[in-house]
Amino acid sequence: MNLARLISTVHNQKNSYMNGYLKALGLSHGQAIALKIIHEEECIKQDDLNKRLQIDKSAVTRILKTLEEKKLIVKTRCEDDKRNQHIVLTDEGKKLYPSIKQIVLQTANEMLEGIDENQQKQLEEILLKMKKNLEGKNE
């Protein structure tokens, strides 16, 4: 199996693994990661969330619409840019965060089982180089 395909396979397996646990919370992988980022930032502009998630803007819009319908987030217009919106967690969204964080940590621990700290560091360095090599190539 070539390296690019292997990276894609691991990514898909990780998402599938997480989705198994997130299903009990009524969330998808994308929704959970969006909630995690919003929690970490406390208040984030939708454009910044798009950049952090690194997925299609329309996919982010769908994720946010679903989270809003579930009353996990609220969106308000930015004073400095009426075209943009601030996104914050509701109390319900904040209550879910510890469970999401636990699932993310559990997934990382499962993925990295049997891989020592030096190997993890090497892998991180290689993946960051690969990411840097591709940044801006499609713009």
At which residue positions do the language-model features occur?
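Residue-level detection of the helix-turn-helix DNA-binding "recognition helix"
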Residues: 19, 23, 39, 54, ...
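Short alpha-helical "packing" element that flanks the helix-turn-helix/winged-helix DNA-binding module
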Residues: 34-35
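N-terminal leader segment of winged-helix/HTH proteins
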Residues: 1-25, 72
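Helix-turn-helix DNA-binding motif, specifically the short coil turn and the N-cap/start of the second
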Residues: 56-59
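Short capping segments at the starts of secondary-structure elements
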Residues: 41-45
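The alpha-helix within a helix-turn-helix
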Residues: 50
